[in-house]
Amino acid sequence: MITIKKLGFSYDTNVVLKDISMELQEGKIYGLLGENGVGKTTLLTLLAGLKDTDAGTLEIDGQIPYDRKPSFLANIYYLPDEVPAPRRKAIDFARDHGQYWTNFSIQKFSEIMNVFDNDENQRMDHMSYGQLKKTFISFALACNTKYLFMDEPTNGLDIPSKAQFRKAVSKYTSDESTLLISTHQARDLEAIIDPIIILDRRDVLLNASLDEIANKLFFDYSSEADPTALYQEMVPGGNIQVLRNTTGAESKVNIEALFNAVLLHKSEIKEMFNK
């Protein structure tokens, strides 16, 4: 389990995260949302042990990430948004680097590369950005780590590749693994992320499962605007609206509309989910 209590981090005098607290349960695929600059990437690098906290505590299964103990590092993988382009064939890179992760599977790497229609025998420095990104996603999933942190993994992927990404994550992630995926393209991941975390620079605005969200909020697709809506947006054929769910009615969570509603009503929605 990941436990974060009153976490703080600054770059010199620039406060990036302050007083952040939350828990992440095992065996979930979390979506991490937030406006640009609120510290999503910083949080991922702190979890991966690449930076040390300035305040508060951060523990993963009782270990402090920045201690970077071999037993801890063997159980995590961090995939940044920007990836390098080694002058090597993808299969050779995977075989050589996979030895650092106890549960790495070269067979799984090859299978996921095939899902992405990627050539494992192509040199990585000859790949397009999208092909390179898919190679590192394949490697990350093939490491079979207990914790996998991904920063904007669908950046640079075309529409078919985004569908392949969802398929790969769904098929090749074990029930015991915990994924935390940062994204500003919520629609790309709507079918696979649950729970949803919405981060603010000084607060966790939301950390809830889709069932919890649907229990508290109602997502309405209607031709008529409701003046009590927390958020409204015109779409072809009418409006998507986010309302308080006062009747227990069922609805499908629209993550983009949820995100916008939370930003407009930070305190109200946080209080709603903390009851």
State what each model feature region is.
Residues 56-67, 71-72:
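Conserved ABC transporter NBD signature motif
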Residues 164-180, 184-243:
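ABC transporter nucleotide-binding domain
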Residues 2, 17-19:
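Conserved structural motif at the start of ABC-family nucleotide-binding domains
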Residues 48:
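Helix-to-loop junction immediately C-terminal to a conserved catalytic motif
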Residues 71, 78-135:
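ABC-family P-loop ATPase nucleotide-binding domains
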Residues 148-152:
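Catalytic Walker B motif of ABC-type/P-loop ATPase nucleotide-binding domains
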Residues 33-35:
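The feature captures the beta-strand-to-loop junction immediately N-terminal to the Walker
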